[in-house]
Amino acid sequence: MNSIRYRDEDLQLRDGTVLKSRIWSPQGNGPWPVLLMRQPYGREIASTITYAHPSWWASKGYLVVIQDVRGQGGSGGEFSGFNQEASDTSQTHNWVRSLPECNGLLGTYGFSYQGLTQLIAEEGTPPPDCIIPAMTGLSEDEHWSCEGGAFWWHLGIGWGLQLAAQKAQREKNWKGWHEIRENLESKKYLYNGHDLLEKYDPEGMAYKWLNLSSSKTPQWKTHKPLSSWLKKPLLLIGGWWDPHLKGILDIFEKAKKAGGNPKLLIGPATHLQWWEGAQRTQLDFFDSHLKEKNKESHFSQINLWNLTTKGWELSVQNKTPTWSLRSEGLASINHLEGFLAPNSDLEADSEVNLVHDPWRPIPSIGGHLSDTAGEANRYQLDIRPDVAVFTSDPILKDLRLEGIPTLFLETNCDRECFDLFVALSIIPKAVENTVTQLSTGVLRIANCDKGITSAREIRLQPILATFKKGDRLRISISGSGWPAIGINPGQSKYLCEGPSPNCLVTTISLLLLNSKLKFESLISS
């Protein structure tokens, strides 16, 4: 790899803006197929937090182009987020294909922001020959900033401040850069984040999304890939603990509806920590479509990592049981009292009162939204008296659960707004004090009528898990999940953010008569 060489080149766009790219070349004279990544974090980094270095891809026979998007890194212009990317992507693709070392074949890769830059372009733009978007989505609401109406507090503020720090560095605002950095390291950003974004990046995406999340008439944007692009060979990569997973599933469905044949891979990954083998899998896909000798793809359509058996499986949309929640009213004060009853059992009319104290909110652990994303043991959380817990009897035979856990529940509340934070877990057979959290979900209820009962639906993060004979299934419900989401103050005139004197103690009544836990299909189409 020592003989791999690189150079920087400029692309001047139609409006005169210059975009800077770093181009890594294999040994020899080419021409070669091109792998393109367009990203906002600096071409020197090249997403090496999750991807192999560009020199590795070049050593496999690819010309690798890492481009700084408009207004970032070494590129000119003003950074305006996703709105700029359709036009800039189209012009970049045309330029890349004109490079003398390019043999005319183009593949794209990258995750998160870099994932979306692969999917949006001007009408009429020829598509890449193959595309590997990872951990991304099209809806700026549901796939980029909010879940169940609640803003991704830790993630959204943290990412927004990263971009704000880059802006400060670009402007040589060293004081601002240090203030942002110190707030991130001290965790003060969880309390000061809104003000810092307003101060240092008021036109940024994160600040805009944060304000939209509390607006009564939000105008959210959803990006639309060209159907011709969705018909091309497409490998979509998701992680069970990644916040953009629902976005990846949405793109998969849209590609199917467009007439494409997308491949889907969901592994044991957070946004920044992937599994061994992810690089080789992507290389195999590129080789299958960009190198003549491997033209036939051997990929199955949907490959999923089983969270409990720790292995890869094909998707099987099998019918799963449903459960209802039962309690004699003590499911929060006694973590062994609440019961998950099979759907064949008769439902019981009962109520559990859950008190949310904003002074001591339930911390978010593990999952896809917290600051400790991944697998987690929530035993210590479930024994708290402000968490309502419902546990099944031991499973009688192996049970495979694939899909989107969805909880249907009626509630009322003594405040005008509140949150429901729900976790689904497995309690392994004969393992003491272990409650392995598999999935979480949230629903933010705003402007409700105090004391009026209403039906709620909480959709959790998708899963694939096999419960062995003797294992038990658990649902845990609380009124907070800090700092994955901001604290709901119980008053609509105040924002949901860090704990403050404006936050009220809130009593949430869970009415169990019509409660139901079911698993909806991973793919709806």
Q: Where would I find each of the regions flagged by the language model?
A:
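Accessory cap/linker subdomain of secreted extracellular hydrolases
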Residues: 51, 59, 123-124, 128-229
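Alpha/beta-hydrolase active-site loop
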Residues: 81-99
